[in-house]
């Protein structure tokens, strides 16, 4: 019968190589931890930078100005003709970095994706700055008017590099992930593809309002200057992003039977709350309208 002739103190196999390998792994781990190159450390830095709380600009005259920090919100809408799951609530435009590439480098990949998320809290990933396109040379603090070009920039990465919301015609190799329509991304290049325009909500009054100031916290339509496509959100198409499940954002104009842009094309440039700098104007409670129907019925008043 076979017996083990070696005692418990005898080492077998390539034990010396295994010891050196374990020591090398530990030394490599400690070096990466000191340099902050561990995956968990990169993940924490990225989330801390992107999710940092931001303070929006407060509009004193009720209009939007160049240099203002705003969040771009698609207001809540009722269930439309889309089939399947439909996301309700106010959705804000956010940058959506690639999950793998965001953990391999401190800088975000270019181009960087965008999506819509169900939050209106101002943070690093959804706070945009309204900038001049360079051609009209508008000064900071000047009012933005309908039909005027502007750029939407967002500070990204640990160095705070400015990225610009951009779009271009779709091709066979370049289109949105879910719908296959014209995609919207963020880039660090300053080109004519970064220009956007605000259009009045009512198309019958759009020509009359051209050249008038754009009011903050009111519904508008944001058109891409180069392709003449409106910014849109698909509440029924979900993307798996670095922060979870979010909605797809594209550049496509959806018109109803009256040639009016559908709610998925309607956006608001939301500014800060003057009462509480950490909140937005959407957090201000609206005046409650008293319901007098029960009182009128009790008094015998027919309405």
Curated annotation (Swiss-Prot):
Record localization: Cytoplasm, Cytoskeleton, Cilium axoneme; Cytoplasm, Cytoskeleton, Flagellum axoneme
Pfam families reported for this sequence: CFAP161 (PF24569)
InterPro entries named among the record's database cross-references: CF161, MIR_dom_sf
Predominant subcellular localization, coarse grouping: cytoplasm
SUPFAM superfamilies: MIR domain
Biological processes per GO annotation: flagellated sperm motility
UniProt entry tagged with the keyword RNA-binding: no
Coiled-coil region: none
A GO cellular-component term linked to this record: sperm flagellum
Subunit structure: Microtubule inner protein component of sperm flagellar doublet microtubules.
Protein name, UniProt field: Cilia- and flagella-associated protein 161
Organism name: Mus musculus (Mouse)
